[in-house]
């Protein structure tokens, strides 16, 4: 056999089975804190092994990975941002998450750049380009994994991982476009944020009005389609596309507080709440499906025979150590009270893979390759598992009273 020639019925059967397996993996993840993405990647690796063993080729399967990942990133960040509240009392949490994402990102990029420069003798600019994708927290993995945590810790994880994605993409795009980095890019960055927020606010308001008027039963894919268009246009002109997605979700979920008063009075907030619930459900279902096949395909790109090199695991372990030492030090200094589990919730995943695949060939490193990325990805997930297992959710006053009552009744 020189190519995969499978009947349509078998393809449909396989897609259905894989979707059900992913659903079961998600259920398992909620019970055991074991990330479902590891199992999805493993299935992809096994399928690649089967194809290579039987001499099968796989056409465009690898080529669609970046597109699938971009759509998944849009949906996951949108889903997470629509769950957030921007009430006044949330501002300290938002700023804490923003500074955490920014400071940890800059410190990690600096440390990894110096590590690659001195240890692997890579050029400084190439070291920085390869360090940035490894320094970003993947919201696509962190957000679904925070479901079992307290509301405050979950909100911090959603904000921090989303900010990390946004800052990382902006930094990566500007690093690619500006060699060397110039001071004026920071002014450009500030102007870019203002423009992105203004455009997103306008689009959010227009979509709210349009959704109210649409009577057709199929209407909730419209805002997703608009976001995909905005994301693609943003990528073409090198502006923060992910910030558009994140701020769009915030504007939709917090129209009463984020819209200026002269816009707010034209919004039907009750109808918007109904539309928002439907949009959240559609986004969550779609994100689940896209995420499933993205990580399956990522596993499919891995060749097992390349994983036998011990140095790959050594480099991966060193990178993970740098990432989490910096994270622990910052959170310990900046946070009062417990820093568990959030100190362990810094997974690598979808966004890291997407940025890594977009590094131009002349800036790619033969040392920091996709196999090192996979090892960092897996190590970070196991640390996240440890964080989830070691953290115990505080009991509510009602639960304590009920337990005391049960004990008293036995005396």
Question: What kind of feature is each model-predicted range?
Answer:
Residues 1-411:
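Transmembrane helical cores of multi-pass secondary ion antiporters/exchangers
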